[in-house]
């Protein structure tokens, strides 16, 4: 089995160094597929893609402002999350999103055209106790680190009410395992916390404060990052239908509790 998680993950870095970003995310993925085809064509090939393949299209949804988050109406067709049929066209992806979209599509093509047992998991915010989050990526891990270090946390754009779904590495690896036991060719799954595990940045900060008993300094920066999602929750229905034995163990509160405990131990 090949599990391809290697990437250049920073939007800002990709904008400043687009050729290097493309070489890493796109060409690097193509090289791995060619090597798999040549030396181990029967091995399942798992690619960790990203929800950024959808660009900023989720921002075109009818999103309402609530007290601490942006949210969809419960009657909205996407209330339970973005599914795999959501458009990846006619939108701003960011340079990072473009290189990852190429990788996503070429992984699908090697499955459907060449016959490799490939799958793309389009991830939301993925994390766990050993995640070394930074300002440019690793949302929850970085938030916990800055908060418990008693530094000021910057909420960039959308009043800090933008929503993300959060998936623990334990649950993600179990999804990989389910696919490994029964692989298909050229499949795509949205993979995140879904409605079971999601929060806004404000809600995440409030959770950290309640868990750690530390008051967090905050500043709001009005200008959002290019292509940033106002609201994104993954619809996990397709994967759960294909792999009904997969169950989530960690919700956002449990994830943050583990991140706080890990930081305090370190």
Predicted regions and their residues:
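Non-catalytic, hydrophobic alpha-helical segments
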Residues: 169-172, 176, 191, 201-204, ...
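Conserved C-terminal active-site "lid" loop/helix of NAD(P)H-dependent oxidoreductases
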Residues: 169, 188, 224-247, 251
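Glycine/proline-rich active-site loop of Rossmann-fold NAD(P)-dependent oxidoreductases
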Residues: 101, 114-117, 127-142, 151, ...
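C-terminal "lid/loop" region of Rossmann-like NAD(P)-dependent oxidoreductases
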Residues: 158-159, 188-189, 202-205, 213-231
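A short C-terminal helix-loop "cap" of Rossmann-like NAD(P)-dependent dehydrogenase/epimerase domains
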Residues: 69-86, 143-157, 182, 210-221
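Conserved mid-core alpha-helix of short-chain dehydrogenase/reductase
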Residues: 31-34, 166, 171-174, 178
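Amphipathic terminal alpha-helices
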Residues: 237-238, 250-266
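N-terminal Rossmann-like NAD(P)+-binding domain of SDR-like oxidoreductases, especially those catalyzing
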Residues: 1-124
């Amino acid at each position: 089995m090949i599990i391809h998680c290697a990437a250049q993950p920073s939007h800002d870095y990709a904008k400043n160094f687009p050729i290097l970003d493309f070489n890493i995310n796109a060409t690097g993925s193509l090289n791995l597929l060619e090597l798999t085809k040549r030396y181990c064509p029967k091995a399942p090939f798992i690619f960790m893609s990203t929800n950024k393949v959808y660009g900023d299209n989720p921002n075109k949804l009818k999103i309402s402002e609530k007290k601490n988050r942006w949210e969809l109406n419960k009657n909205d067709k996407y209330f339970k999350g973005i599914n795999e049929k959501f458009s990846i066209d006619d939108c701003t992806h960011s340079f990072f999103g473009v290189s990852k979209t190429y990788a996503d599509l070429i992984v699908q093509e090697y499955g459907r055209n060449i016959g490799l047992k490939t799958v793309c998991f389009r991830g939301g915010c993925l994390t766990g106790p050993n995640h070394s989050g930074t300002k440019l990526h690793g949302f929850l891990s970085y938030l916990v680190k800055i908060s418990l270090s008693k530094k000021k946390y910057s909420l960039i754009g959308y009043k800090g009410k933008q929503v993300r779904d959060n998936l623990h590495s334990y649950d993600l690896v179990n999804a990989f395992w389910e696919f490994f036991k029964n692989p298909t060719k050229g499949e795509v799954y949205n993979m995140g916390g879904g409605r079971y595990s999601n929060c806004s940045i404000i809600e995440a900060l409030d959770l950290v404060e309640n868990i750690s008993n530390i008051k967090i300094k905050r500043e709001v920066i009005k200008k959002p990052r290019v292509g940033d999602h106002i609201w994104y929750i993954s619809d996990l229905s397709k994967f759960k239908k294909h792999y009904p034995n997969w169950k989530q163990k960690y919700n956002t509160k449990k994830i943050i509790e583990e991140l706080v405990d890990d930081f305090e131990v370190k």
